[in-house]
A protein has these predicted regions:
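Regulatory sensory and allosteric helical modules in signal-transduction proteins
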Residues: 1-23
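A short, aliphatic-rich beta-strand micro-motif
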Residues: 27-34
Length: 240
């Protein structure tokens, strides 16, 4: 599915699962999908024939319905270079989906080359969707803190720049409370503040396809994380 975004349709009244017709008599099936307080997707079938509903539309509707009623939750981690971070989270039992992209900058739909200049405000980021019955947000945040150098500002391994800053981005207040508790406990034990930023997710743009699952496609590719870090993810015990 395309990037999650809010879609505004002018001069049309929206009712979930109902037909909405614009002034140009353009027929649509519009399904606003609310996911913990925000629109996750809108199904928009552009056809003058109300009976037109193909296989692509059916699959899209199934995905939208899954997002709306499914138990999975979403969280976004900025952890330096996103190649290794994606591989790390994919190894965690209970993580059901990951994708890499750029988060919380001001440039709209940036390319990797644009983000690389450090002039877009974006951080390299991994979108993680997980099953909370198998792995908790608390455990994911603790794993994240063990994966990164949490006291290094704008630098992870040999990668340096604001695009490599560390952060956790959430889409609801309940998650913020959990993250604050975990991060606060970690900082208290360490006796100092971390460089990890905690913010609501303002935007996330999926990176180019060649960045997705990069280390699966390129097993010998660059990665700043050690093999021991990946073992930490692989051996994460299931939630009781």
């Amino acid at each position: 599915m395309e990037r999650e975004r809010t879609v505004i349709v002018p001069d049309v009244e929206l009712f979930p699962g109902h037909i909405a017709c614009s002034s140009e008599s353009r027929s649509e099936i519009v399904v606003p999908c609310w996911k913990r307080g925000r629109i996750a997707a809108v199904l928009d079938i552009d056809s003058k024939d109300l009976n037109t509903f193909d296989e692509v539309d059916r699959k899209y509707l199934e995905e939208v319905t899954s997002l709306l009623y499914g138990k999975e939750r979403d969280i976004w981690f900025a952890a330096g270079c996103f190649w290794g971070a994606q591989k790390f989270f994919k190894l965690v039992d209970g993580v059901v989906f990951t994708e890499v992209g750029f988060a919380n900058g001001w440039e709209i739909d940036p390319t990797y080359k644009q983000v690389y200049t450090d002039e877009t405000g974006h951080a390299e980021c991994v979108h993680v969707r997980y099953d909370p019955e198998k792995v908790s947000l608390e455990r994911l945040v603790n794993l994240f803190l063990n994966m990164i150098d949490p006291f290094s500002l704008n630098k992870q391994g040999e990668d340096e720049g604001t695009r490599y800053r560390t952060g956790v981005y959430y889409d609801n207040g309940e998650d913020r409370e959990v993250i604050e508790t975990v991060l606060g406990s970690f900082e208290n034990k360490a006796g100092r503040k971390s460089a990890v930023e905690l913010q609501p997710l303002r935007c996330f743009y999926k990176a180019e396809e060649y960045h997705q699952n990069y280390l699966d496609k390129n097993p010998g590719g660059y990665c700043h994380l050690s093999p021991a870090i990946f073992e930490l993810a692989r051996k994460t015990p299931k939630e009781q």
